[in-house]
């Protein structure tokens, strides 16, 4: 009787467009498609290293609720557009770049003055529109990081040393934009109970979908290697106690779920501002929310399921220190 587990012998990559690909792996033993697909998907969404703007200083602006003469966008929309610029650094962890432009016209990511070891992946990305006499002078700090880090939980040392006019951004470092997977039936000779894993991956262009899969697999192998070399400790009591790590996706605002306006407003009315707040609520609790019906509940459940989450989950140490409400 065969006791060894099958390993994939066919790995195919099909391009679906720029920075978008479908990766097919088969055959897997029954059940391993979901086991590995879900693990890879969660690592791809939460643990990939990338680059993002983390701080912005705009000449003539003290805070994000300001406006600039001659600039069509207000500062909030300007910051959102800056967050959409995809940077890539070479052999360094942070850099400060400058965006200066004046006169009527469109300001794009290609107008940013870059250092030799920094590049912009999407130079045609629109940042702002200037009218006659308009002027824009922006300093942008770009850092290397992992996952998603809200600005309100980041630490910058002495609070009194903050620079007036410096705006701290929520940073989405992940170069992976979307990931989904499906498990289909596979066949090897007479066996028809095998799995075929199909992964659909879209990246920002900092890395290719194929490289994203490789990196996520290496992360999983590195983490699981600890269990392969498992050894008992002298006393469990001597092990240092650590606070449970919180999945970065739980720190994202519920607005990132892109719910309908009705559903989003109902959640905020119940002081549900973060995904971590939402998943701790049960279906019955949400149905008691005014104006939130079964249709909105099903929408919320589907959006959470697409991210590997469900309602009624339990979280320790929530909310984390420094999380604004």
Swiss-Prot record:
Region (Alpha C-terminal domain (alpha-CTD)) residue spans: 246-325
Region of interest called Alpha N-terminal domain (alpha-NTD), as start-end residue ranges on this chain: 1-231
CDD domains: RNAP_alpha_NTD (cd06928)
Gene Ontology biological-process annotations: DNA-templated transcription
Keywords: DNA-directed RNA polymerase, Nucleotidyltransferase, Transcription, Transferase
Recorded family membership: Belongs to the RNA polymerase alpha chain family.
Subunit structure: Homodimer. The RNAP catalytic core consists of 2 alpha, 1 beta, 1 beta' and 1 omega subunit. When a sigma factor is associated with the core the holoenzyme is formed, which can initiate transcription.
Function: DNA-dependent RNA polymerase catalyzes the transcription of DNA into RNA using the four ribonucleoside triphosphates as substrates.
Protein name in the entry: DNA-directed RNA polymerase subunit alpha
High-level lineage: Bacteria, Pseudomonadati, Pseudomonadota, Betaproteobacteria, Burkholderiales
